[in-house]
Amino acid sequence: MHCDVLWHNAQLMTLDAADGGLGIVDDGIVACRHGHIVYAGAAAQAPALQPDSAHDCRRRWISPGLIDCHTHLVYAGNRANEFEQRLRGASYADIAAAGGGIVATVRATRAADDAALLAASLPRLDAMLGEGVTTLEIKSGYGLTLDDEVKQLRVARQLAALRKVEVVPTFLGAHAVPPGGQAQHYIDQVCTQMIPAIATQGLAEAVDVFCEHLAFSQAQAEKVFVAAQAHGLRIKIHAEQLSNQHGAELAARYGALSADHIEYLDQTGIAAMAAAGTVAVLLPGAFYFTRDTQLPPIAALRTAGVPLALATDCNPGTSPLTSPLLAMNMAATLFRMTVDECIAGFTREAARALGRSERLGQLRAGMDCDLAIWNIDAPADLVYRMGFNPLHARVWRGHLC
């Protein structure tokens, strides 16, 4: 069998195990043709391969490229002042009520043009790529007008054109009530003006809503979901981060790809997510940074068979984090997730949360050839160590980056 590139003498984490584990292969190879994997597995069981080029991995580990399935990467401004306020005792709600929080970033993002937004966002993207990320989601939500939301999504598209990475755009117009606005009137604008325009321009694949007592109600979220589905957009939700608004249960009824945060998720919401196949996206960076104490119900989610994904939640206010490796460590330490769960959370399950499990997140024939090659002794090293970047090489669509 002809292939363009062959990586051999490697240890693999295929994430393709029947038991849901890492799918470890001790003496493995990965063969790529036209940007897709044609074989990934044990060298001894491989077909005869005729590569145009071959790379000896010298027993390094290969995993699927990392996938960050929840980010707010495109924004302007800085909220270090709010960090200081929280250290002095202010709560998330206190800061938002005083005109800070999301709307502070809205003001800065509205004031920035495309070039300024791109310049601010590229270093954050490059930091993620430097830790093996090959796909990431980018949400809007810091514009809160049609023109400014489109601007954010346009910059997300520009980032994908400038780097070897897949960007999955999500419209998060229902992130906060605009300064001086009224929630119901704004939701009407989101549904009747923004969603149709963004869908027509092909700028987003999904919508997201911040369903919370200081943002939008369950009824308002449902209105967004109805409009989104009418325009062919998929559903995601920020749910149960600060209180139980039953947003995850609602989103699951609409076949949501994921419900994210979910610290206050109850058993009814868990059952709804399990029945719908909705992924739980856990965001330990936000939990850590806001010094939260309400743990997401990890054990109950496991028992129910809800897939567990992880993400950085890169954003300026509650998770200024661009390190998936540190997010894995946080998930293990704070949420007591296992090594296998942490690695799967940034690969196989993250792909599921983005509706891409048919081509991303695993090493097997037919998948896109997105790889991360690591200088580690064992998979646990990716989760165990902090401030350590063992990435040897990143491969996107079969090309070394």
UniProtKB/Swiss-Prot annotation:
Gene Ontology biological-process entries: L-histidine catabolic process to glutamate and formamide; L-histidine catabolic process to glutamate and formate
Protein family according to the UniProt entry: Belongs to the metallo-dependent hydrolases superfamily. HutI family.
Source superkingdom: Bacteria
NCBIfam families per record: hutI
Keyword Disulfide bond: no
Pfam families for the chain: Amidohydro_1
Binding residues for Zn(2+): 70, 72, 238, 313
One GO location term (cellular component): cytoplasm
Pathway(s) this gene product operates in, as recorded in its UniProt entry: Amino-acid degradation; L-histidine degradation into L-glutamate; N-formimidoyl-L-glutamate from L-histidine: step 3/3
Stretches that traverse the bilayer: none
Reactions the enzyme catalyzes: 4-imidazolone-5-propanoate + H2O = N-formimidoyl-L-glutamate
Function, as annotated: Catalyzes the hydrolytic cleavage of the carbon-nitrogen bond in imidazolone-5-propanoate to yield N-formimidoyl-L-glutamate. It is the third step in the universal histidine degradation pathway.
Keywords: Cytoplasm, Histidine metabolism, Hydrolase, Iron, Metal-binding, Zinc
Binding site for 4-imidazolone-5-propanoate: 79, 142, 175, 241, 318
EC number(s) per entry: 3.5.2.7
Cofactor binding note from Swiss-Prot or TrEMBL: Binds 1 zinc or iron ion per subunit.
Cofactor(s) named in the record: Zn(2+); Fe(3+)
InterPro entries xref list: Amidohydro-rel, HutI, Metal-dep_hydrolase_composite, Metal_Hydrolase
UniProt subcellular location: Cytoplasm
Binding site for N-formimidoyl-L-glutamate: 142, 315, 317
Ligand binding (Fe(3+)): 70, 72, 238, 313
A Gene Ontology molecular function term of the record: iron ion binding
Protein's gene: hutI
Protein name, per record: Imidazolonepropionase
